[in-house]
């Protein structure tokens, strides 16, 4: 279809032919939103404070505006469509909210256009969220759907944006959504949705933990709600869900209406009386987290009728994504594992607990999260810690309180040298890579080389040197993938 219906369905209100829409953000998401709005006959204006981001839109003939000017003109717009990283606290969106102008995200726009039939018969959305495990679970779900012979597309916070896949001939969407995306998707009602777990994260974006949790809960408002029962916050969301069908999953033996583990096999007692799905040993993701991811994916797949055989085939052949518990090397009896995607304390804890003896490389940007409970839970697994990044002192303080006998090394980079370098840890030292930096090596690469070398000196045969940072990477790297690649490069250099 090339335009909005002349008689606009309620689901699209206030979006209609010629409707003036402010697109907040001119980057990749903004480009997709502006293109879709133009295609369907609305009148978008693109807002960004970077002239470089506005130039391509202006060259296409679209009006552009700065955020300060947009604030002054806000009542002239019927709708604002915001990029997912835009916090509700920024002046532009605060002004829109105060003026009563609706604010959608790109996911909300996609949901409404799909529900209105603008791309043909609406798809069934199977949505995954949670603090950790989203990407693995959604990828596993997509593999299950394909193995079951269903026409399914992987999208959202993984793969392609939802707006970019609605033209594809799919009946099902396997959608990973973040709390940012869900915050701006108030009308989303998926066929089935899963909350894997809830832990402190992104508190620099969400005003409170309650707001973060409420955003996650939006995936449980459709037909089938799925949540992890071993996580108290996720379980509470399931109890309060308005969904007609509520399904829990757990590591233990499942009750009726649940999926779980019995006799080392995954078992479905929610969509069948008692159906064995697959052996735990066939799950390629290490530790309890892999079992939980497989259970969540299986619950969503079973909710749309995927048979047990297809689920087992998909899991057995599944390959974990890069920088997610990825074994980089084994040398001298020591295993080196890249879990750079563990960007918050909850994920780091799950990663560490998958191994019996760990030299932990951690640190980065904690985003306002505390990690005392996590460090206490994994202290018995730690035989050493090497700390990097801006918030390394917070990690060191938690270690000093909950794992005081664990030796700790802090790696200091040039721009960090004015920061606190030591805390009261019994066996601690500081490595200043700025004093011995290799020519042409980036700060992040130098930090990681020093960190891996220090970890190697701590480790013994049978140990795992684990990069599970518990923080974001942007203080010293361009992203978690860059951090993971730096780790792999450093490992190869240290063990050769």
Swiss-Prot record:
Keyword Transmembrane helix: no
Binding site for ATP: 130-136
Keyword Acyltransferase: no
Recorded superkingdom: Bacteria
Coiled-coil regions listed: none
Gene Ontology CC, one term: cytoplasm
GO process annotations (BP): cell division; cell wall organization; peptidoglycan biosynthetic process; regulation of cell shape
A GO molecular function held by the record: UDP-N-acetylmuramoylalanine-D-glutamate ligase activity
EC number assigned by the record: 6.3.2.9
Subcellular location as annotated: Cytoplasm
Pfam family, one: Mur_ligase_M
Catalysed reaction equations from the record: UDP-N-acetyl-alpha-D-muramoyl-L-alanine + D-glutamate + ATP = UDP-N-acetyl-alpha-D-muramoyl-L-alanyl-D-glutamate + ADP + phosphate + H(+)
Broad enzyme group: ligase
Pathway: Cell wall biogenesis; peptidoglycan biosynthesis
Keywords: ATP-binding, Cell cycle, Cell division, Cell shape, Cell wall biogenesis/degradation, Cytoplasm, Ligase, Nucleotide-binding, Peptidoglycan synthesis
Sequence intervals crossing the membrane: none
InterPro entries with a match to the protein in the record: Mur-like_cat_sf, Mur_ligase_C, Mur_ligase_C_dom_sf, Mur_ligase_cen, MurD
Family to which this protein belongs: Belongs to the MurCDEF family.
Function field: Cell wall formation. Catalyzes the addition of glutamate to the nucleotide precursor UDP-N-acetylmuramoyl-L-alanine (UMA).
Protein name: UDP-N-acetylmuramoylalanine--D-glutamate ligase
Taxonomic source organism: Mycobacterium tuberculosis (strain CDC 1551 / Oshkosh)
